[in-house]
């Protein structure tokens, strides 16, 4: 696990976008694992700029998103399908048929989970997986005590996650109580992982992910065992780390 510390959120976003762009230049048909939420918005903004500046071409890229809310129509402006179109897909030349999210509206949700996992494997696996991290160190929607071997599955969201996501909805009651998420086992199959975090409220989660015991109580801690994980954080999120353990960029 390598840790890169940037001055602020914009610096973190630019560094992550640089790494994604470099991956696409190196392998134009890269398979990207993408995340939603407020953390990667700046990264997507910078990737769109790189596309507009003819630095990166998404025409052969394929993507698989980490998660989607359960039984929230994709037409809803809080669905992750909607988020991805608004923040990235509608602004670059990625082919719609090459973008994939779990279908939270599927009638047979267990079959959908198995099919989604199989689709990732059939594509050749994820080259670079982007992750955010929750205050409780959840990755994807894998909450504390999720088994590390878990593959794509239906998740009951914790009260803290519902509370954190309530700011995106009209009211707390509107936040879905379940989601479909890649499992930790799915995430660990990725060839490279970029974990992004910003803000002082993420400092404990980052500390426990980097230094803590590897335990399901801290889902991010399993990334210590991944062969190529890069943690990209701003100074506030890195505030509890020992400076000798990271590189300022």
From Swiss-Prot:
Pathway: Amino-sugar metabolism; N-acetylneuraminate degradation; D-fructose 6-phosphate from N-acetylneuraminate: step 5/5
Keyword set includes Chaperone: no
Gene Ontology molecular function: glucosamine-6-phosphate deaminase activity; identical protein binding
Catalytic center residues: 67 (proton acceptor), 136 (for ring-opening step), 138 (proton acceptor), 143 (for ring-opening step)
Highest taxon above the source species: Bacteria
Reactions catalysed: alpha-D-glucosamine 6-phosphate + H2O = beta-D-fructose 6-phosphate + NH4(+)
Keywords associated with the record: Carbohydrate metabolism, Hydrolase
GO biological process entries: carbohydrate metabolic process; glucosamine catabolic process; N-acetylglucosamine catabolic process; N-acetylneuraminate catabolic process
SUPFAM superfamilies cross-referenced by the UniProt entry: NagB/RpiA/CoA transferase-like (SSF100950)
Purpose of the protein: Catalyzes the reversible isomerization-deamination of glucosamine 6-phosphate (GlcN6P) to form fructose 6-phosphate (Fru6P) and ammonium ion.
Protein name: Glucosamine-6-phosphate deaminase
Source organism phylogeny: Bacteria, Bacillati, Bacillota, Clostridia, Peptostreptococcales
Gene responsible for this protein: nagB
């Amino acid at each position: 696990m390598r840790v890169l510390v940037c001055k602020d959120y914009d610096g973190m976003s630019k560094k992550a976008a640089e790494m994604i762009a470099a991956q696409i230049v190196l392998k134009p048909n890269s398979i990207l694992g993408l995340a939603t939420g407020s953390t990667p918005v700046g990264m997507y903004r910078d990737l769109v700029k790189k596309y507009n500046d003819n630095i990166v071409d998404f025409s052969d890229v394929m993507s698989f998103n980490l998660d989607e809310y359960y039984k929230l129509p994709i037409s809803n402006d809080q669905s992750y399908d909607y988020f991805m179109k608004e923040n990235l897909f509608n602004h670059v030349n990625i082919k719609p048929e090459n973008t994939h999210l779990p279908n939270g509206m599927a009638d047979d949700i267990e079959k959908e989970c198995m099919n989604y996992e199989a689709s990732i494997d059939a594509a050749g696996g994820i080259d670079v997986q982007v992750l955010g991290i929750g205050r409780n160190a959840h990755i994807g929607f894998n909450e504390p005590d999720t088994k590390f071997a878990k593959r794509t599955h239906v998740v009951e969201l914790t009260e803290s996650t519902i509370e954190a996501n309530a700011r995106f909805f009209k009211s707390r009651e509107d936040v879905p109580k379940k989601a479909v998420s890649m499992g930790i086992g799915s995430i660990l199959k990725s060839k490279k992982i970029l974990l992004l975090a910003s803000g002082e409220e993420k400092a404990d989660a980052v500390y426990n992910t980097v230094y803590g015991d590897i335990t399901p109580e801290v889902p991010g801690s399993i990334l210590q065992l991944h062969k190529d994980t890069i943690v990209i954080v701003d100074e506030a999120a890195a505030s509890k780390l020992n400076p000798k353990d990271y590189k300022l960029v």
